[in-house]
Amino acid sequence: MFLEIVSPEAILFSSEVDAIAVPGEHGEFQMLNNHAPIVANLKEGLVKIHVHSQQHLVLDDLNGLLVPHVDDDKILTLQINSGTLEFNDNKAIVLAD
């Protein structure tokens, strides 16, 4: 699936990923390929991005906002204050504050 994370200042992430976990208003939930279409409000918390296992990450290009998860270097995390998620046709867009 394709993921794009956008803030008011910049595009923070734009790439193919294996999965994404987000802090929904009623708890964290995860999306994989072919997830049903959804629009959801996000609360403060961590967005967890599961990158492709064969994908080589260059963290210098990520402006220091996305950091590797402490237990798994194939998971990137991004702290958000709030946001909105739209998922449709294997494309997720996160509008993050």
Where are each of the predicted segments found?
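Compact, glycine-rich, soluble single-domain proteins
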Residues: 2-97
